[in-house]
């Protein structure tokens, strides 16, 4: 459930 930046796009992880 955390928000990270992957390849300049929003990436929502499983936690």
Swiss-Prot record:
Its main location: secreted. Keywords: Cell wall, Secreted. It is found in: Secreted, Cell wall. One of its GO terms (cellular component) is extracellular region. Belongs to the thaumatin family. This is Osmotin-like protein. It comes from Nicotiana tabacum.
């Amino acid at each position: 459930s955390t928000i990270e930046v992957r390849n300049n796009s929003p990436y929502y992880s499983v936690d």
